[in-house]
């Protein structure tokens, strides 16, 4: 595990409980995100499960599950997995690094990767996307959400807890070229 991945994991482990409490119901206030997820569900059709990659406390997995979709969640942070399972006991969650997922080839019908790639260094984005492609079933659908721009924002403190997190912004044209 490289330092950037390790720092991301440690940082989210530190803030998992607070993050879960603050964001567990965020989908209620995000009609655009819900619409994107509904389109993912329709496009995936009978292909399942759909994975909430970088699931955090599982708010996206919960929304997908509420739409009648077989859903699972994967996150780098063990403490986030604990929170996700606590908040959503009916959904399966497991730990995984999107640069080296523990899941078998062709095992997911769809992926909702909402704002998780923002912690992947630019030079590793293609590797993460290849790994996502590896676990997608033929005809599977990938939905990626990210911040638009070129900057990298850094956070040393989050809710009075020490963290070491970079948030990378990407241009749609560069993301399209990687896909």
Task: Set out the residue ranges of the language-model regions.
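Conserved class I S-adenosyl-L-methionine
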Residues: 1-45, 150
């Amino acid at each position: 595990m490289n330092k950037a991945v390790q720092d991301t994991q440690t940082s989210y482990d530190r803030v998992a409980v607070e993050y879960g409490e603050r964001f567990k119901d965020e989908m209620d206030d995000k009609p655009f995100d819900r619409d994107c997820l509904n389109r993912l569900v329709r496009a995936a059709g009978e292909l399942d499960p759909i994975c909430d990659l970088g699931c955090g406390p599982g708010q996206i997995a919960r929304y997908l599950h509420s739409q009648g979709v077989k859903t699972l969640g994967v996150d780098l942070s063990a403490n986030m997995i604990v929170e996700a399972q606590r908040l959503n006991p009916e959904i399966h969650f497991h730990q995984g690094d999107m640069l080296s997922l523990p899941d078998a080839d062709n095992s997911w019908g769809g992926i909702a990767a909402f704002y998780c790639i923002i912690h992947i260094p630019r030079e590793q984005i293609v590797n993460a996307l290849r790994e996502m492609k590896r676990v997608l079933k033929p005809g599977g659908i990938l939905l990626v959400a990210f911040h638009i721009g070129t900057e990298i924002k850094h956070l040393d403190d989050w809710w009075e807890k020490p963290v070491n997190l970079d948030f990378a912004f990407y241009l749609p044209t560069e993301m399209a070229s990687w896909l």
